[in-house]
Amino acid sequence: MCHSHRRIFSQLAQQLIREGKKDKAKAALDYAEKMIPAFNVPYDWQNGAVQMAEAYYQLGDSTKADDMMKALADKAVEYLTWYLSMDDNRFSISTREFEYHWAVLDAEVKIMKKYNSKLAEIYAPKVEELYNLYAERYERLQKMEKK
């Protein structure tokens, strides 16, 4: 339920920004942060958090935007690292989940770059590093299956 509420607030903020009502957009975002705090409902790609961060970037509040994007990127990195720590059997049945979280992290980095966030310098190399680890492992597993 709170996932959809955060998403609705992000949509409201984006519409207010399009209408030039930046003060109202900022107030809506701040209200959503107060009423749906991340410690109760963690930021997630699917619950409007990315759109909220992007709205904060558009409003010039890069500190709040970066805080949200960092939490989102850290979550993706944590999942990706966890998948890579699995044994070969579990890893091979989790490749779609890995690919999903990798795509999420990649998209988050693109948003960071779009708004010239210094976070991109931290997470862009992670995207490449994690993908390379995945590709090496996936290739090794494919070779093992052919034998």
Model region roles, listed by residue range:
Residues 1-147:
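C-terminal luminal/periplasmic domains and tails of membrane-associated envelope-modifying transferases
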